[in-house]
Regions:
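Generic detector of isolated residues embedded in canonical secondary-structure elements
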Residues: 22, 30-33, 115, 179, ...
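Contiguous N-terminal and early-domain "leader" segments and peripheral loops that mark the onset or edge
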Residues: 1-3, 110-116, 236, 240
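Single, function-defining residue in the core of a domain
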Residues: 4, 15-16, 27, 67-69, ...
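Long, contiguous hydrophobic alpha-helical segments, chiefly transmembrane helices and signal peptides
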Residues: 20, 34-37, 73-74, 113, ...
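Gly/serine-rich nucleotide phosphate-binding loop at the start of the catalytic core
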Residues: 1-48, 52-53
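Active-site-proximal, Lys/Arg-enriched surface segment
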Residues: 10, 40-121, 222-227
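Generic detector of short, locally flexible boundary/turn motifs and exposed helical patches
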Residues: 1, 31-40, 78-83, 91-93, ...
C-alpha cells in the first residue's frame, strides 16, 4: 500500500507527465525497491477493486440516507488516444485498438475505457473504471456493474448518453432501484396512439402544427416541451421529452446527445433542465 501511495502522489504532483524514476522522490524506499515492486510485486487486482467499491458505496449511500438526496450512477466512456498505431510504433502498446470516436467522428487509435461514477449531494466518486477490449460489449460491462450495486435507500437515477439507453440496461438498473435518464437517438421507435413511428418523424409532425407543446421556464430561459408517455421497443410506460428553446422551435437534422454535451446536465435531475436545445431524453414516468 505504501508503494501504491507513493506512485499515486508522484503521478498527481507531476501532472501525469512524470517518469517511473520519479516514484522514489516521494518514497522512503530506494528506486530499485519500487522497480522490483512494479516488475515482480504481487497483489490481487480484484481485492483492490472490491475494497474501493465498498468504500465508495459506504460514502455515497450513507450520504443519501442522511440527506434524502438521490444517488446518481453516471456512466460514460472515453478514448485515451495514442499518436501511432501498433503497426508503426517502435514499441507496440498492449491492448490498444482502433475505436469509433463519437467526439472526433472517426476511428481513433488508443485505449478505450468505461467509467462509472456514483454521486450524491455534490459528492462524486469513481466506482469502476473498466478497460474495453472488444471481448465483451460496453452494454454487458455496464449491465454487470448494475447487477452488483446495492439497492439505494432513496429513489435514485442512472444517467447516460444515447449509447447506453438499451432495454437490458434500463431493466437491470430498474431492478436495482435506479430510474434511467438518458438521451435517445432519433431513429428510436415510439407508438403514439398505437401507431409505430420513428421519433424524428413524430418530431417533424409536431414542429409543423406546434400543438401539444408546453412552455416551461428553467433558470430564466423558456423552452417548448412535448411529453410522450407510452412504449418504446422493449420498454413499457416510458416518458420521452422533446424540448426546444422558445425562439427556435425547429427540428435539427441530427439530434443525438454526445458525451461532451451530456456532462453539463448530468448533475440535474429535474426534467426541463435535463432536456434542452432540441435534445431527446428518456425519463421514468412520474
Amino acid at each position: 500500500m505504501n508503494h501504491l501511495m507513493s506512485i499515486l502522489i508522484s503521478i498527481f504532483i507531476s501532472g501525469y507527465h512524470g517518469k517511473t524514476t520519479d516514484f522514489a522522490k516521494n518514497s522512503s524506499c530506494h528506486r530499485t525497491t519500487i522497480a522490483h515492486f512494479l516488475n515482480s510485486g504481487k497483489w490481487d487486482d480484484s481485492l483492490l477493486s472490491d475494497t474501493l467499491k465498498c468504500s465508495v458505496i459506504e460514502i455515497i449511500y450513507s450520504e443519501a440516507a442522511r440527506t434524502g438526496k438521490s444517488v446518481l450512477c453516471i456512466v460514460d466512456d472515453t478514448i485515451a488516444s495514442k499518436t501511432k498505431p501498433s503497426s508503426r510504433a517502435l514499441h507496440p502498446i498492449e491492448d490498444a485498438y482502433f475505436h469509433q470516436s463519437h467526439l472526433k467522428g472517426k476511428q481513433d487509435y488508443g485505449h478505450q475505457a468505461v467509467a462509472v461514477m456514483l454521486s450524491c449531494n455534490g459528492i462524486v466518486l469513481n466506482y469502476a473504471f473498466v478497460m474495453y477490449n472488444k471481448s465483451i460489449s460496453k452494454i454487458d460491462i455496464v449491465q454487470s456493474i448494475a447487477k452488483e450495486l446495492p439497492v439505494p435507500p432513496v429513489m435514485s437515477y442512472f444517467l447516460c448518453d444515447c449509447w447506453y439507453v438499451s432495454e437490458k440496461i434500463i431493466n437491470t438498473f430498474a431492478q436495482r432501484g435506479f430510474h434511467t435518464i438518458g438521451a435517445l437517438k432519433t431513429n428510436r421507435l415510439l407508438y403514439p396512439s398505437g401507431m409505430k413511428k420513428k421519433l424524428r418523424e413524430l418530431a417533424a409532425e409536431l414542429s409543423v402544427t406546434h400543438r401539444e407543446f408546453d412552455l416551461v421556464t428553467v433558470k430564466k430561459r423558456n423552452y417548448y416541451v412535448y411529453r410522450y408517455e407510452g412504449n418504446l421497443n422493449g420498454i413499457e410506460n416510458a416518458v420521452v421529452l422533446l424540448s426546444y428553446p422558445e425562439k427556435h422551435l425547429v427540428i435539427p437534422k441530427h439530434c443525438v446527445l454526445s458525451s461532451v454535451q451530456t456532462q453539463p446536465y448530468l448533475h440535474r435531475r429535474f426534467f426541463p433542465g435535463m432536456c434542452v436545445d432540441g435534445r431527446l431524453k428518456y425519463f421514468p414516468p412520474v
